[in-house]
Amino acid sequence: MKIGFVLPCYNEFENIFILIKQIKKIFNNHLIVIVDDSSTNEIKDKIIKYKKIKYFKRKAKSGRGSAVLFGMKKILQDSKIDLIVEMDTDLSSHPKELPKNIKYFKRKKLDLLVMSRYLKGSKIKNWPLKRRLFSFLSNKLAKFLLRVNVSDYTMGYRIYSRSATKHVINNCGKIGDGFIVLSEILAELNLNKF
């Protein structure tokens, strides 16, 4: 099984290399696609030394959601990739739980699995109070509006099937290009019975 990782980033110079090392320590058969949303720091020169990584720097800041959709398109060019993992690069999540979550994903034959900061035993790391409050309120609003059975609507740590990813890149990104795409993806996949 080959896994594709989509890592949208913006000014995450230190964190991106920590995350890459964490992923490489756990997974052998993978491709990492980094979509740099026009960071002011230069990571390309350090990224080149890594194998199994494709790096794309966008000319202008276009938003996290459009970065993820762009990364998904690039990942799907590799026909051997079975699962796509979306992860934020701010180190708020760690890939060490992924093997267990991937087993669950495959056993249940899911098309989407969203990790959560709001389930029992979950933790939010490295976040100031303002960001925690914004996330909490955004989730409450999304839950009220979308009514999709997930506990964390704004979590950027997800596993997608190849078919769900194809559907996402063909049907999402129409209502915005930032964090709203996270909720748009949930609504779109739920509406289409994924």
Task: Give residue ranges: language-model regions.
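Catalytic donor-sugar/metal-binding loop of nucleotide-sugar-dependent glycosyltransferases
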Residues: 174, 186-194
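Cell-envelope/extracellular polymer assembly enzymes that use nucleotide-activated donors
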Residues: 2-4, 31, 184
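Short, well-formed alpha-helical segments that are part of the catalytic scaffolds
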Residues: 11-25
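Short beta-strand/loop segment that forms part of the nucleotide-sugar
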Residues: 30-39, 58
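A conserved acidic beta->alpha catalytic loop
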Residues: 36-44, 91
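Donor nucleotide-sugar binding loop of glycosyltransferases
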Residues: 12-15, 39, 94
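Acceptor/aglycone-binding surface of glycosyltransferases and processive sugar-polymer synthases
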Residues: 54-74, 95-179
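Short beta-strand-to-loop acidic/aromatic patch adjacent to the donor-nucleotide binding site
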Residues: 80-90
